[in-house]
UniProtKB/Swiss-Prot annotation:
<dbReference type="GO" id="GO:0005737">
    <property type="term" value="C:cytoplasm"/>
</dbReference>
<dbReference type="InterPro" id="IPR042103">
    <property type="entry name" value="SerRS_1_N_sf"/>
</dbReference>
<feature type="binding site">
    <location>
        <position position="284"/>
    </location>
    <ligand>
        <name>L-serine</name>
    </ligand>
</feature>
<dbReference type="GO" id="GO:0004828">
    <property type="term" value="F:serine-tRNA ligase activity"/>
</dbReference>
<dbReference type="GO" id="GO:0140096">
    <property type="term" value="F:catalytic activity, acting on a protein"/>
</dbReference>
<dbReference type="GO" id="GO:0006434">
    <property type="term" value="P:seryl-tRNA aminoacylation"/>
</dbReference>
<dbReference type="InterPro" id="IPR015866">
    <property type="entry name" value="Ser-tRNA-synth_1_N"/>
</dbReference>
<keyword id="KW-0963">Cytoplasm</keyword>
<keyword id="KW-0030">Aminoacyl-tRNA synthetase</keyword>
<dbReference type="InterPro" id="IPR002314">
    <property type="entry name" value="aa-tRNA-synt_IIb"/>
</dbReference>
<protein>
    <recommendedName>
        <fullName>Serine--tRNA ligase 2</fullName>
        <ecNumber>6.1.1.11</ecNumber>
    </recommendedName>
</protein>
<feature type="binding site">
    <location>
        <position position="383"/>
    </location>
    <ligand>
        <name>L-serine</name>
    </ligand>
</feature>
<comment type="subunit">
    <text>Homodimer. The tRNA molecule binds across the dimer.</text>
</comment>
<dbReference type="InterPro" id="IPR045864">
    <property type="entry name" value="aa-tRNA-synth_II/BPL/LPL"/>
</dbReference>
<keyword id="KW-0436">Ligase</keyword>
<feature type="binding site">
    <location>
        <begin position="261"/>
        <end position="263"/>
    </location>
    <ligand>
        <name>ATP</name>
    </ligand>
</feature>
<dbReference type="Pfam" id="PF02403">
    <property type="entry name" value="Seryl_tRNA_N"/>
</dbReference>
Amino acid sequence: MLDVKMIRQNPDFVKEQLGHRGVAASDIDDLLAADEKRRELIAKSEQLKSTRNQVSGEISQKKRNKEDASAEIAEMQKVSADVKTLDEERRTVDAQVQDMAAHLPNMPHPDVPVSLKEEDAVELRRIGTPRHFDFTPKAHWDIGEDLGILDFERGAKVSGSRFLYYVGDGAKLERAVYNFFLDQHEAEGYTEVLPPYMVTDESMYGTGQFPKFKEDAFRITTQDLTLIPTAEVPLVNYYRDEVIPAEKLPVYFTALSPAFREEAGSAGRDTKGLIRLHQFNKVEMVKFTKPEDSWDELEKLTNNAESLLKKLGLPYHVITLTTGDMSFTAAMTHDLEVWFPEQDKYREISSCSNCTDFQARRAHIQYRDDDGKLQFVHTLNGSGLAVGRTVAAILENYQNEDGTVTIPDVLVPYMHGKTKIEKQG
């Protein structure tokens, strides 16, 4: 959440910056009008409370002097009733201000490309050369089905569209990938966490999914809980309403979890394969840092994700997303996109974002600076990586003409020495 005081003091700047993210200037004006009304109500209430205290003193004095205080008592009762009315109105307006502020996205960093179009993203670097095939490469879903390691038909039978079974070496490959990821992150100083897969509305609010994207979530209505769309939610909320000791910063967390996505608005897109599912595994990285360190930590976070693709030998590039394409909470996002030969293009496999103090302000996560003053931490998150998409990229990039798939060298130990996936019996 943005600081309402900051918006009040810099309205034109905020309108310009959030305008780059598609926010109408009238939304800022409406927020400021409500904020002004709230402040007026507070001032009136405080003035009446001062009057009430003064009259209370007069009543006490008259009673000590055994004088008639009925007029003052009547006045104090009226003032108290007015204070109650004003405070109730203030609470209503305050809720309106908070709701308006909760729907505003984070301010973009000055280096973020200004555009509402995703195709205007800026490429930072390109690593690896796409493999030249002596045969026509197949799509990963065809490879997986031909080998008997991915079963989309039975997944749809049991759960509906955008679900599948990993079978045999398919399940082993998925497990090999995420264990490799977790081991690499642990070596980089991340603490592994096994988080809850269902969270409260307050947790979803803290990381910015609620209230704006509530319709996109899978809800457990009987318990008023939500299936997590990413492990970012429980990891960031680990420190909700807490003060992190400054000497502990930065804190690095990593977690494997399923991600549950409604994928509203994706009808007709990526209807086959592992790219867009309602349930998929993902290894997440989350950082809590001091504000002055967060931009360096974003580069480290991105490098952590990149190192996985390098070790897997998968061609990829890194892009900086535009102001209109970043996630709601991000001030800057670097996307890693891996090469898919059958599609002849790069597809997203990781998003690494600096959310500055946006989530920390919503979730009340703070630390004490050198002067002992409470400050909000900065939070960062990144996929490290999306497991299913990594499996898909391996199947396509390491496929052989005979239909088998060579296992990347770094995964062979995780596959108990197996170097190739062949058709299942």
